[in-house]
Amino acid sequence: VRGGEEPSFSALSSKNLIPNESYSPATAPLAPGTALDLSGDEPQPGAYFNYQSCTAAWSFTLADARTIAVTASHCGKPGDKVWAGTADGDFSYPAEPIGEVIYSDFYAEDSHDLDVAFIEITGSADYYVPGAVDNSVATSLAHLPLHVCKLGRVTDETCGTLIHGAAMAQLNSGGLQRDSIAARARVCSTNGDSGGPVYGEVEGEQTIVGVVSGTTQRLEEGHTCETTQTDMELSFTLATDIQVLAKEVLGPMA
């Protein structure tokens, strides 16, 4: 999140998961970890431009040929425009939008308590991606990997141990508090990494198992994950829940 507090969480209850399956989208316009800028405003020369700096978890194509990218719900509302982000986090002007948020669960009339948004990709650009992650996404899991990593546009790849699986939590973002179903791991992250992929080894294969939602602590200004010893915990929305939601609100995948 740019210009606001990173969401924080406190676990309330637990939820069981199911056996292992995954899929690799046949067509994926954005690589996992792609930097994104989102805003409900239009950039104007010489004027202040307020936008959210976030990351894409993965992308896929629907049966109706629309291409979709996945990020965090607190990154944007339906109707927000999306631009390709840069390595330094500064907005690159002039630039044409590459897409638009078409669904954001926190803003849905019938929310599923998931920190996830879907972006319809309608354009292309030079994308910044800080690393490579296999585009294999979990559709069901017997259990989450005990060791997971995340890829974000700001802190790149960081890894750590799983603390617990899916649980109801309280997410605080932009002064608002929301219920959110999320797992948690001891992984460092910061503003701008939200929406990025969380992944681990499932049956010997690197698999995306979630989407970065927030952290229990802030990374102090001027510090990095490499230079900071912290008990920070990362919360992430499960990919399995996102897959079910995508079919419900968007329709079948290609």
Predicted feature locations:
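Surface-exposed flexible segments
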Residues: 2-15, 136-139, 221-232
